């Protein structure tokens, strides 16, 4: 039996539907972040937990170009002369975990230059320095906001001297947006280790933990102590000025400050290390 194609689905109709589909928002990236059964020591080595955390491998500009959130105006590297190949300019693995009190963040990064000098320094201008920031919405909702209630950015400047602005918190609160302040000292612990593999003075390992109650709980009263199955919003922003001003950016799982574009971070139970088969 042959079914007739309705007139509204003939070429003009197909074009209309294709155009309509292109206007629909892309499905949010989903990542599953395991609970850590033992709290790691924050010392600039991820050895205790890197195999038990969320990570999805190495990111460089070529991989980012294939991602659904890629925007060349935002995801970019900069050319200041005598640059290495793009994959050597910046590539990184990022790690996340959680327990009843903390979110844990890690990064293992190959970078050709460590640059934490801002020509027009302000404490809040982490994005003009080498920095890795985790944008977290907790709990995730369906409202499009830019650093409104429930939105947080935990930003770690890659400076082992740990200046007062080295662990920065951009966040919202009920009725307020873009609040800027250091992460409360009692709520954060982090370490930066430069040149950990003896390869380049720009390489680094970042390890950090942020206590959730005085940060996420302050940003949104709807936050509650974490449970398996909770859904947060997430984006990673890695800034890389390389001696310039604003410089390069990697954006993962999102398209910028609008939390409606951020990925879904699902809290799960503990993970097991990757198993190697005997044959």
Label every PLM stretch briefly:
Residues 27-279:
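Structural preference for beta-rich elements and adjacent junctions enriched in aromatics
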Residues 6, 23-25:
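Glycine-centered signal
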Residues 11-22:
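Bacterial N-terminal signal peptides
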